[in-house]
């Protein structure tokens, strides 16, 4: 039987690790300086544990893990455009780091971009858990199957819903 409370906790830790890998100078999930390799190893272990919990029949965990990690540079590139869109689109933004640390929309979008890649790999449950977690934090509800291009910015996003077919 799956302990869903523990699964959610693991998912939150995974997101923290992935954000630390994507933006090591902004986020630090391990609360002290660690190398990119150490962060990646911890995130890979965390993702493997989650996949082992949610799959009834063991798939190729390594394929899912390797594919997600191979997509991280592209996710980072797209998130950089999202940060740029917020910075340029909101006159109140004083710097890019402020967008990453203080804007709820960036949190929702960054979690969505990770969840979307897992959704495309047909990973069950985890992508939706991620975006619902973002929804609970930010008030922004983005379905993991939604198609969202680069330079995406939501200003004052409470109550925004983006469905898979929007």
Which ranges hold each PLM region?
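Terminal amphipathic alpha-helical/low-complexity segments used for targeting or macromolecular assembly
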Residues: 1-132
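Structural signal for interior beta-strand "rungs" in well-ordered beta-sheet cores
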Residues: 134-166
């Amino acid at each position: 039987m799956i302990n869903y409370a523990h699964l959610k906790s693991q998912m939150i830790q995974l997101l923290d690790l992935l954000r630390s890998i994507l933006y090591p100078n902004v986020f630090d999930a391990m609360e002290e300086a660690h190398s990119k390799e150490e962060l990646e190893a911890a995130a890979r272990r965390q993702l493997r544990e989650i996949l082992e919990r949610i799959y009834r029949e063991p798939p190729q965990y390594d394929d899912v893990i390797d594919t997600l990690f191979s997509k991280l540079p592209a996710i980072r590139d797209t998130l950089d455009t999202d940060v740029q869109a917020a910075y340029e689109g909101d006159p109140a933004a004083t710097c890019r780091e402020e967008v990453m640390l203080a804007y709820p929309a960036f949190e929702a979008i960054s979690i969505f971009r990770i969840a979307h890649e897992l959704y495309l790999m047909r990973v069950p449950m985890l992508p939706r858990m991620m975006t619902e977690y973002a929804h609970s934090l930010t008030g922004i509800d983005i379905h993991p199957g939604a198609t969202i291009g680069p330079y995406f910015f939501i200003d004052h996003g409470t109550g925004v819903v983006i469905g898979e077919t929007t």
